[in-house]
Amino acid sequence: DILVADFRSGMQRLFGGRGVGFVPVTSVAAKFRPTIEQKAEGWTTWSMLTDRHHRYTLSGMTFEPKGKRSSISVKTTERYPELKTVSSLKFLYERNSCTRMELVCNGTQDTIREILEPTSGITQYEQTGTFTEAFFNFADAEGLQALGVALEDDSGVIVDNYSLRGNSGMILSRLDSTRCRELNKIRPYALVVLQYGLNIVSDSVLEYGWYVKRMEETVRHVRVCFPDADILMLGVSDRSRQVNGIFETMPAVLALLHAQRQVARRSGIAFWNVFGAMGGENSMVRFVENNWASKDYTHLSFRGGKEIASALLKAILLEKEFYDEADKVAR
């Protein structure tokens, strides 16, 4: 949520909506997210980074209970005003036979007891009201395969952050198209934003023709998975290396940025230049000096993410103005 948190907040402030959206059962980044407090016990995590036996959607993870009981707890935070309360609480799962679920909301003594609907496709269980926290407990859960929970409103803007660390983006070509279309029925995405590339930047690689080919294939597959969604690709951010004691932009960053532009142009999708928004060449030095990025001269901090989110939001709003004006002329 380094970039997404402030982007989500800005969109919801302007267009309505509340909540962090989809949250996987757990993840390696769970304890670092300031937008949600979460804890999970009694689950086996499967990731498409290491597993080829399960079918995956955008989160790239699926979860199966281990032991007699499994649980999920989530609690909203006040990091942003739009996160404090939500009106919809959902549990998303993609396989089930006869799981018994107990749900406690807002720390009350009242327990909701349900037998989850049997399914072999992506399904959601929903409660509506006013929520700040929830505790899910599962028993007799053999055969259950869970995705996560969603905290949101059913109106306004929902921004889901599907983060899978160590992912170059090309792995999205392995998304299961049937599963993704099932997901799209209950979470109909209007826009899919692809932000990848930083972890493949290397001093030893300046030719990214192979990347262009693979990412074109990936974009085509994402379109098959989410045919009603527009796609926006974010270019790689700046990354510095030290040369004679001075930090400067790695040449590979510029090479990859050119490759990403080619992918977007050839695929007919929108493109936004994060590198340019940072200030262009050697801008990472300024970000580190301002504590907007870590001293590895690679990774943005939450404060740096806020700068990029603000620039992205302004760019989208500017494009919206153009479309609104064109619509007026057309009328």
Stretches with model-predicted labels:
Residues 1, 235, 301:
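Ser/Thr-glycine-rich phosphate-binding loops at phosphate-binding pockets of nucleotides
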Residues 2-213, 299:
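Conserved SGNH/GDSL esterase-like catalytic core that processes O-acyl groups on lipids
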Residues 3, 7, 176-180, 211-218, ...:
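Stable alpha-helical elements in mature extracytoplasmic
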Residues 6-17, 152, 182-186, 195, ...:
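Structured segments of extracytoplasmic/periplasmic soluble domains
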Residues 160, 232, 270-272:
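Hydrophobic/aromatic beta-strand patches that form the interior of the parallel beta-sheet core
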Residues 191-197, 215-223, 230-235, 239, ...:
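Conserved, well-ordered alpha-helix/loop/beta-strand core segments that scaffold catalytic motifs
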Residues 238-331:
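Catalytic His-Asp segment of secreted/periplasmic serine-dependent ester chemistry enzymes
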